[in-house]
Amino acid sequence: MDFISKTIGLRLGYNKTHKLIWSLSKNNPIFIQTNHFLEYIIKNDPFFCGLILIDFQLMQYIVVHKNQLGNFSPLKNNLPNSINLFLKLKIATEIQSNFNSVFILEERLHFLFFKYLNKMKNLKMLNNLKIKVKIKFLNNPILEPQWIFYKLHQDLYKGINIRRALAKISSNVIKKGAEGVKIQIKGRINGVDKATVIVEEKGKMPLQNLSSEINYYSRALKTVYGLLGVKIWVFKGFLLK
């Protein structure tokens, strides 16, 4: 019998998003590809080495001058040849960030994103394309499941035993303020010919409670013996008390 994980969805009086927020008009469906592009940049570009993308928002905004407020109409100003985009990212890193490093990353991402959009066929004829980029670094990234996956990947790459790595990561997450953590790994672990399952769970994990704030992340981990399926749950507490 299957069980319901209730990872990310509607909560009582609380809506949670998964990775991205779209606030674009229906006339611009070409921006759907941008989430894959941003993940590729942060993973492969040397400027973003050691950074992990936690969440990002892509919104469209309209610039209106004071003299045009009387004649302003969203339907008339939202034309395909004048697109203004606002890109907001949440990034986790081990290195302490300062104003200069954030500014350099924002300028680099602005350049790459603008260059990428100009190459798209439907956007070649654009006369006015403006992009704003804002990057926010998380203060406590260890509570994010994406960061836990990154640390697990590092430990396995160094040759640390998988059970020891899971125990160390889960204990660190509990020490940083999480009320519960659960990590599940499936596949050919340690090169065994038979697929096995390892589950490391510490603290509470009320998956059936709608008022619980649980972050979830799943991804495939590539090893020499094949792919390992990794699922991570992090319980931060109850939203309604």
Curated annotation (Swiss-Prot):
Pfam families, alphabetically? Ribosomal_S3_C (PF00189)
Q: Name one GO molecular function term.
A: rRNA binding
Q: Which UniProt keywords apply?
A: Plastid, Ribonucleoprotein, Ribosomal protein, RNA-binding, rRNA-binding
Q: GO terms for biological process?
A: translation
Checking InterPro entries in the record gives: Ribosomal_S3_C_sf (IPR036419), Ribosomal_uS3_bac-typ (IPR005704), Ribosomal_uS3_C (IPR001351)
A Gene Ontology term for the protein's cellular component: plastid
Q: Where in the cell is it found?
A: Plastid
Q: Major location, coarse class?
A: plastid
Subunit architecture: Part of the 30S ribosomal subunit.
Q: Which family does it belong to?
A: Belongs to the universal ribosomal protein uS3 family.
Q: Read off the PANTHER family from this record.
A: 30S/40S RIBOSOMAL PROTEIN S3, SMALL RIBOSOMAL SUBUNIT PROTEIN US3C
This protein is called what? Small ribosomal subunit protein uS3c
Provenance organism: Helicosporidium sp. subsp. Simulium jonesii
